[in-house]
Curated annotation (Swiss-Prot):
GO biological process: cell wall organization; peptidoglycan biosynthetic process; peptidoglycan metabolic process; regulation of cell shape; response to antibiotic
Highest rank taxon of the organism: Bacteria
Organism from which the protein derives: Geobacter sulfurreducens (strain ATCC 51573 / DSM 12127 / PCA)
Gene from which this protein is expressed: uppP
Protein name: Undecaprenyl-diphosphatase
Family of the protein in this entry: Belongs to the UppP family.
Pfam families, per the entry: BacA (PF02673)
Protein location: Cell inner membrane
Upper taxonomic lineage: Bacteria, Pseudomonadati, Thermodesulfobacteriota, Desulfuromonadia, Geobacterales
Length: 269
């Protein structure tokens, strides 16, 4: 993989991992449509690390507060909601961590060539996001997050292993159906993703440490990491601004158009 391809895929990963439009679908469909080779383990590590950097930088204050609240809870008890929130996030991470460890590779192998199914899932879960955005009561803020809600959103996150679903999309959808505001749903979705993205990056770095970085792949690795970090940061800012001021419908329409375009291409071949 050359540096240009790496930079393009890094931008694609950074934006689509953050926005509710499915990064896994785009990282399968775009190289397939353009005739590019599949990315290897080295490049996957760079993309995950870049996304993690973007999330950690953007939510650095939230992370600091969560760590402080967790320490306070351990020292003084969990009488306040803020002291319980870090552990709700950890609890919500457990279902996806288990599912990812056991099902990621079989699902990845099954969907690798299932372009029609991926396009249909882009459309179907886009419509589900539209339904949640339209009908969800949108009353509750972060102080109403409890263990039940965190676990339900965490269970929904398991579906993100399927290309076309979108991790941020399905967790925001679940949070909206539970009654949270758009802003709270998006912010909790990102906080819930931090342990998952970090864990995936650590596992892939462990594999990379065992195999080593192949000759000629360091430059694409760094290019993909840098572009995914920058585009991921911009993606977070864009999504939070849109949900605060408008709605999630721009992403719904994008999913419908992208899925429809892929289906049209497949049927026209």
């Amino acid at each position: 993989m050359d540096i240009m391809h790496a930079a393009v895929l890094g931008i694609l990963q950074g934006l689509t991992e953050i926005l509710p439009i499915s990064s896994s679908a785009h990282l399968i469909l775009v190289p397939w449509l353009l005739g590019w080779p599949e990315s290897g383990l080295t490049f996957d590590v760079g993309l995950h690390v870049g996304t993690l950097i973007a999330l950690c930088v953007y939510f650095r204050r939230d992370i600091a507060y969560l760590i402080s609240d967790a320490i306070t809870g351990l020292r003084e008890g969990f009488g306040s909601q803020t002291s319980r929130l870090p552990f709700f996030i950890i609890a919500g991470t457990v279902p996806a961590a288990i599912a990812g460890k056991t099902l990621e590779k079989p699902i990845e192998e099954f969907f690798r060539g299932s372009h029609t199914l991926i396009a249909l899932l882009l459309i179907a879960f886009g419509l589900l996001l539209a339904l949640a955005d339209t009908t969800g009561p949108k009353r509750w803020r972060m102080d109403r997050v409890d263990l039940r809600g965190a676990l339900l959103i965490g269970l929904a996150q398991c579906l993100a292993l399927i290309p076309g679903v979108s991790r941020s999309g399905i967790t925001i959808t679940a949070a909206l159906f539970l009654g949270f505001t758009r802003d709270t749903a998006a912010r909790f979705s990102f906080l819930l993703s931090l342990p998952i993205v970090a864990g995936a990056g650590i596992l892939k770095m462990g594999e990379l440490a065992r195999h080593g970085i192949p000759a000629g792949e360091l430059a694409p690795l760094l290019a993909g990491m840098a572009t995914s970090a920058v585009s991921g940061y911009l993606g977070v800012a864009l999504l939070l601004r849109l949900v605060q001021r408008y709605s999630l419908y721009p992403f719904v329409w994008y999913r419908l158009l992208a899925g429809g375009a892929v289906l049209a291409y497949l049927f026209a071949r």
